């Protein structure tokens, strides 16, 4: 799913910023500085070459050959001047995808032209970093979602990236920087997550966070994205969703709880990539994470972005 930390916020710096949060009484100035640093890192990540604003296409593969290029006669058509009319063919055989470029298509792998006489086996993002091909400003690679394989395209000159307006937020408020109780599940639970395309996956939930706000307790299930992660991931919706904030909910990444205590800073709640781009496959909050509470903190709806709801 499209909730990998490395592409949401940008690897080690993002983790460092979360692991030293200003939470629960450390002072307004410290909270302000922590959140502003986090916001800067988020904007830098979004506008980077691998940021969500570069996404320009997503094509699901059928078994066998899938011709790819900029002219209408191809199975996969991307109308872009950086792509040859007939760029090549993606071949799906079982769970393996290969690519055979057309002669003189100018397709590069690791900066070198790909041999048009031999297919190149492509690793998907399911096992980590996918094999990335290039054509001019375009980058394309294989993704796997719920057992389906597709080709994702990035355009380094995508107008969404070049015309990025910046992000807007609720005012920073210490009220939303909280210490929560972490309720561990023994054993960890599998929770069903549906993405924006209707695909289903089972994610691992090691436990829930329970926090107090407005005179009552609230509970959110967390997700462990990969074994050994230093963070937990939360998908949530609230009473601002579809109004001030993105209709399909928001995300929150928190440091791994210690001694049953979780640090939640909703001032660092952020939009899924689907709020910024039509070509992401964002997970939706599970029903138990949709709260009748106005979380007036974190990122607001992106002006000019796609709009989705449950």
Task: State the predicted function of each range.
Residues 1-13:
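Bacterial N-terminal signal peptides that target proteins for export
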Residues 10-22:
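Bacterial N-terminal signal peptides
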Residues 27-59:
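N-terminal pre-domain segments of enzymes
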Residues 54-55, 60-128:
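Forkhead-associated
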Residues 111-125, 217-268:
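An exposed acidic His-Trp-rich patch
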Residues 134-201:
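Surface-exposed beta-loop interaction hotspot
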Residues 166-169, 239-243, 251, 255, ...:
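Extended, aromatic/histidine-rich regions of cofactor-dependent oxidoreductases associated
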Residues 179-241, 246:
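Flexible, glycine-rich surface segments
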């Amino acid at each position: 799913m499209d909730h990998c930390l490395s592409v949401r916020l940008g690897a080690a710096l993002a983790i460092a910023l979360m692991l030293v949060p200003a939470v629960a009484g450390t002072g307004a100035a410290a909270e302000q500085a922590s959140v502003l640093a986090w916001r800067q890192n988020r904007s830098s990540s979004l506008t980077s070459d691998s940021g969500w604003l570069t996404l320009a296409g997503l094509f699901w593969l059928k078994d066998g050959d899938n011709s790819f290029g900029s002219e209408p006669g191809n199975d996969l058509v991307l109308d872009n001047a950086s792509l040859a009319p007939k760029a090549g063919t993606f071949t799906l055989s079982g769970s393996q995808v290969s690519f055979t470029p057309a002669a003189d298509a100018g397709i590069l792998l690791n900066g070198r032209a790909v041999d048009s006489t031999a297919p190149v086996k492509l690793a998907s993002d399911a096992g980590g970093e996918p094999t990335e091909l290039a054509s001019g400003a375009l980058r394309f690679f294989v993704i796997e979602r719920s057992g389906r394989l597709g080709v994702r395209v990035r355009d380094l000159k995508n107008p969404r990236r070049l015309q990025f307006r910046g992000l807007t937020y609720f005012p920073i408020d210490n009220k939303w920087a909280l210490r929560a109780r972490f309720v561990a599940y023994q054993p960890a639970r599998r929770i069903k997550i549906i993405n924006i395309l209707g695909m289903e996956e089972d994610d691992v939930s090691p436990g829930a966070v329970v926090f107090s706000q407005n005179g009552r307790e609230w509970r959110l299930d967390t997700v462990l994205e990969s074994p050994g992660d230093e963070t937990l991931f939360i998908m949530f919706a609230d009473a601002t969703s579809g109004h001030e904030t993105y209709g399909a909910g928001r995300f929150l990444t928190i440091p791994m709880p210690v001694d049953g205590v979780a640090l939640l800073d909703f001032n660092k709640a952020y939009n899924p990539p689907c709020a910024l781009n039509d070509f992401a496959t964002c997970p939706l909050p599970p029903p138990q994470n949709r709260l009748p509470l106005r979380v007036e903190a974190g990122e607001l709806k992106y002006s000019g972005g796609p709009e989705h709801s449950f």
